[in-house]
Regions:
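C-terminal amphipathic helix plus adjacent low-complexity
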Residues: 344-354, 360-480, 487-490, 519-520
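Nucleotide-activated donor-binding/catalytic signature segment of Leloir-type glycosyltransferases, i.e.
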Residues: 68, 235-236, 244-269
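Short hydrophobic beta-strand element within catalytic cores of glycosyltransferases
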Residues: 305-308, 318, 325-326
């Protein structure tokens, strides 16, 4: 078998100069892991094409590649390299969604080998534009590997043929991600109280590109009142400094700043230590581009009980109340088109995030159950690790890739398949399957008691000013709900506004816990 692999230079396991090495994480980490597994597999012959220079090419092939049944070449030499081997690749793979360059190379040269791409992130306009470019160029057995069934469904909703997709879960290194028996010393090293109950949130700090953290902070005062030794440990690269500043201001006003540890510069090389010092893992993702949630698997492998949203790519991670807990997620049909087709991923990410709300009553209940019972923490955590070892290790992931490759090669033919693509789609329909519950226009909405008090006292609300430009019905909705509960239909009628616009504002208010709905 001869496999053609396309990869960027920065993922190659070589040091071209003193400054070329870097620590990859997230999607890049998965791509790097898969690349290394293929390179080190001596049973497979590979040609690797990359954006390397001529000098890089000489160094690599002289010192390393010949020992690994591997040839590495720059793009300009790819055709001649294939001719030298006197064998056309059986299949081609890129551990990324952008496979257009490979497709063009194949089609121009009239090769017929299948091409595989990997979807890491899918939800923004820019992501779907990449997919759109490939659709009309596909052949029969070209395939996108999706890390979750949810991601596959997003492709299908977009109009992508199911037969050109496959689902393979990510896997984690259970030797690296495991419990550490010396938690006391680890906590001392990180200046964390040894007797504290630590809830870990690990991920990018951004209101729309991972998780809006503000609702979780609002739960803390009540939890801390019952459990004064509680610590919320938030570790993640900060993508929005202004947002972080506002979260810190909020924590001070809520008087919980002494119960929060911020780690804005996590050590990605030793990322496992953050799991090993913690007791509970919390991930409430509401990002439209969430395809999997690798940190959830890392936490489970580290024997942490996880509490996660049953949103998007998270849906298949756990069995509820057995090896973790799911929090219900809600949305409604609200007009997202104008924001989606805006080229700013950040702006759309924030707006979409505020259109997703979770059942925070459930979250509080499950957190209290775990906080109050170290035995339950241990029991759920052990089952979580067993799940990973049985179903989601790196070896299982790699073998699944090899099995899929063999299957595609065996079934390939020379028929080219050109696919149609809609020019315009309803974005709410595109993401309609992401949440577990769909609010209707007839659901009743109420003000929370806290909001009623603030209205009566004319107190300050915790709002993020930049978001208010997208939600201009907040004030009238609050004052109307202060008189009586209403549905979206009723609010839209009284305000003489569209139902989708009212729904958008109501979801924001739900997200920020200013109102509640008759959610089960």
């Amino acid at each position: 078998m001869l496999i053609l692999i396309e990869t960027p230079k920065n993922l190659l396991p070589f040091k071209f100069n003193k400054t070329s090495s870097s620590i990859s994480h997230g999607a890049n980490n998965i791509s790097s892991i898969l690349l290394n597994l293929f390179i080190n597999d001596l049973t497979i012959h590979k040609i690797i094409v990359s954006d390397i220079s001529d000098s890089d090419y000489k160094i690599i092939n002289k010192e390393y590649a010949s020992k690994k049944n591997t040839l590495i070449t720059p793009y300009k030499n790819l055709k001649s390299q294939i001719e030298k081997t006197e064998k056309i690749p059986d299949i081609c793979i890129n551990f990324d969604a952008n496979i257009t360059k490979l497709i063009h190379f194949r089609n121009i040269n009239k090769y017929t080998y299948p091409i595989i791409g990997l979807i890491h992130s899918l939800g923004f306009y820019s992501h779907f534009k990449t997919i759109e470019l490939t659709k009309k160029l596909l052949q029969e057995y070209d395939t996108y590997i999706c890390p979750s069934k949810n991601t596959q469904q997003s492709l299908i909703n977009f109009g992508f043929p199911k037969k050109n997709t496959a689902v393979i879960s990510y896997g984690v290194n259970t030797t690296k991600f495991k419990p550490n028996n010396n938690k006391t010393q680890l906590r001392k090293d990180l200046s964390i109280a040894t007797n504290a109950t630590v809830i870990l949130i690990l991920g990018r700090v951004s209101p729309g590109l991972k998780t809006d953290l503000s609702p979780a902070l609002k739960l803390m005062p009540n939890l801390v009142k019952k459990h004064p030794d509680l610590i919320l440990y938030i570790a993640g690269t900060v993508l929005d400094e202004t947002y972080l500043s506002k979260l810190k201001t909020m924590s001070k006003k809520l008087k919980i700043e002494n119960h929060i540890i911020w780690e804005p510069f996590p050590d990605h090389k030793n990322i496992q230590k953050y799991y090993q010092v913690s007791d509970i893992f919390l991930s409430l993702s509401d990002c439209c581009a969430e395809t999997f949630g690798l940190t959830v698997l890392e936490a489970m492998a580290s024997s942490l009980p996880v509490i996660i949203s049953n949103f998007a790519g998270y849906k298949d991670h756990i069995k509820h109340k057995s090896n973790g807990y799911y929090i219900s997620s809600y949305t409604a049909d609200c007009n997202l088109e104008n924001d989606y087709y805006n080229p700013s991923n950040k702006e759309f990410g924030e707006i979409y995030s505020q259109s997703i709300t979770l059942n925070y009553k459930q979250l509080k209940t499950y957190l209290l159950q775990l906080i109050q019972s170290p035995d339950l923490q241990k029991q759920i955590g052990q089952k979580a690790r067993e799940t990973i070892k049985e179903k989601k290790t790196q070896d299982i992931m790699y073998n699944s890739y090899k099995n899929l490759i063999s299957h595609i090669i065996n079934k390939k033919n020379n028929e080219e398949k050109f696919l149609e693509i809609p020019d315009y789609i309803n974005i709410s329909d595109l993401f309609s399957h992401q949440c577990s519950h769909q609010l209707t226009y007839n659901d009743l909405f109420y003000l929370t008691n806290d909001t009623k008090e603030k209205v009566e006292k004319e107190s300050h609300f915790f709002f993020f000013e930049n978001q208010l430009t997208n939600y201009d019905l907040i004030t009238p909705i609050i004052f109307m709900l202060n008189t009586e509960p209403m549905t979206i239909n009723q609010l839209a009628s009284k305000l003489n506004k569209s139902k989708t616009l009212v729904a958008k504002n109501c979801l924001f208010l739900l997200k920020q816990t200013f109102i509640r709905a008759n959610m089960t």
